UniProtKB/Swiss-Prot annotation:
Protein name according to UniProt: Holocytochrome c-type synthase
Reaction equation(s) it catalyzes: holo-[cytochrome c] = apo-[cytochrome c] + heme b
Native source organism of the sequence: Gallus gallus (Chicken)
Annotated gene: HCCS
Stretches for region Disordered: 1-39
Domain of life: Eukaryota
Length: 273
């Protein structure tokens, strides 16, 4: 789940990008369309001093992310100055075009459906420009590939859909704890571990299956309890109309007896169903 920082203000051209992308983003909390008071779960609504204690869990880029979420009646965004990003082990990218960038990219960001821990907001996905800058920082060079602005639009859609799919799979596991956490889980932080193959992935490879092309670990807040989920990403072939091509293997890590018991139960249900 690549989420990134933002820096300069989005231009009127950037604000018009959603129609070009055929992508409707949820209005930000400050948008006039969002006047209804949000209702939060009492178990997630922390006191102000508790939130202050958990500021290190919140990525710097998420604090101002809603300034780049498209609002139907508001365009532009104020300047953002983020210095650190403590939650995803990456320096914060920005919304500035790279020096030799061949075409303009949208700086509009889409709100996800994933609740952010210790907050009444959702996680916000990176813009096309942020994703481009992140790939450059990791060593990618656009001149080596035949890539267009439309390709970047599709890459963002695939990226966002993969994360939505991953969260839905996590919610299936969390349904086992609905009595324990009736308000539902929220995402605290995450990290990519593409070359740190899980034991399950290695065992599958020994059996002749391909290794995953990526791995993420997501840390979920289950009403005050931290739960780590391992997500292995496998190539599923052609991209469908919903921008899904990845097969996800999502399960709680063996960090506790509760997680072990959950996986034993689910394995038994799958075996006997």
């Amino acid at each position: 789940m690549g989420l990134s920082a933002s820096s300069p203000a989005a231009t009127a051209q950037s604000a018009a990008e959603p129609s070009k992308q055929h992508q409707v983003a949820s209005p930000p909390s400050e948008c006039p369309m969002h006047q209804e008071k949000m209702r939060g779960c009492p178990m997630h609504m922390k006191a102000s001093d508790r939130r202050a204690e958990n500021t290190d869990d919140v990525p710097a880029h998420q604090e101002r992310a809603y300034e780049y979420v498209a609002c139907p009646v508001k365009s532009g965004a104020s300047q953002v100055n983020d210095d650190i990003d403590p939650s995803n082990m990456m320096p914060p990218p920005n919304q500035l075009p790279s020096p030799d960038q061949p075409f303009p990219l949208s700086t509009v960001r889409e709100e996800s459906s994933i609740p952010r821990a210790h907050s009444d907001k959702k996680w916000v996905y990176p813009s096309e420009q942020m994703f481009w800058n992140a790939m450059l920082r990791k060593g990618w060079r656009w001149k080596d590939d035949d890539i267009t602005s439309e390709d970047m639009t599709n890459i963002i859609k695939i990226h966002n859909q993969n994360n939505e799919q991953a969260w839905k799979e996590i919610l299936k596991w969390e349904a086992l704890h609905a009595m324990e956490c009736p308000c539902g889980p929220s995402l605290m932080r995450f990290g990519g571990k593409a070359k740190e193959y899980s034991p399950r992935a290695r065992i599958r490879s020994w059996m002749g299956y391909e290794l995953p092309f990526d791995r993420h670990d997501w840390i979920v807040d289950r009403c005050g309890k931290e739960v780590r989920y391992v997500i292995d990403y496998y190539d599923g072939g052609a991209v469908d109309k919903n921008y899904q091509f990845t097969i996800l293997d999502v399960r709680p890590a063996f960090d506790s007896l509760s997680a072990v018991w959950d996986r034993m139960k689910v394995a038994w249900w799958r075996w006997t169903s």
